[in-house]
Amino acid sequence: MKESPKRILLKLSGEALGENGRLFDQDMILRVGRILSDVAATGAQLGVVIGAGNIWRGRQSKEMDAVTADHMGMLGTVINCLCMRDAVERTGGHAVVFSAIDMPRVCEPYNVQSARQAMSEGKVVFFAGGSGNPFFTTDTAVVLRAAEMQADMLLLAKNVDGVYTADPNKDPNAQLIPDISYAEALERRLRVGEDVVEQTGGDAAAGLLV
């Protein structure tokens, strides 16, 4: 029997925290928090990178300085991570936020050894601030943190329910593909965690679930 992954890195869309046009939906937030708490209670070590799509997206910033726009997105991830830390703790779990942008009165400054230790203690570890640098997406950040945490598996929780022939948010004719290998997705040029593949040369494929 294949052994379950012990250390998991999850990329969670910020849009998952809001519904019906709201930035934050408390019922959804608590639901996600309970799921994360339950996963940690099984003994799995869980780290989470959250996007900021419910607060700020790069496509809103075409007329802004790109660095400023990216810094706004990074700060949005801090807000989302603080929100989810609270949700995990309200549902019986233990959590900590490490930020790549120093703000010690709000969350812990990111340190590889401290984050690994927190995961080994059974805390849900939230990685805020992206990679700490502009011009890199949170998909890139989760690959970086997965490598640093020596994760066994990388999960991408996108704002769609699977892999489609095209972006279902843009193309009403997009069709869900119920079963596809990562290699086939790449061959067909489907957009499945494309930043992950670009940053790892495809090495993430074996341990990547979307």
Where are these regions (language model features)?
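N-terminal glycine-/serine-/threonine-rich phosphate-binding loop
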Residues: M1-Q45
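Charged helix-capping and loop-helix junction motifs
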Residues: D25-L30, Y110-Q113, T138-V143, G193-D195
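Alpha-helix C-terminal capping segments
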Residues: A40-A41, L82-G92, L144-D152, T200-A206
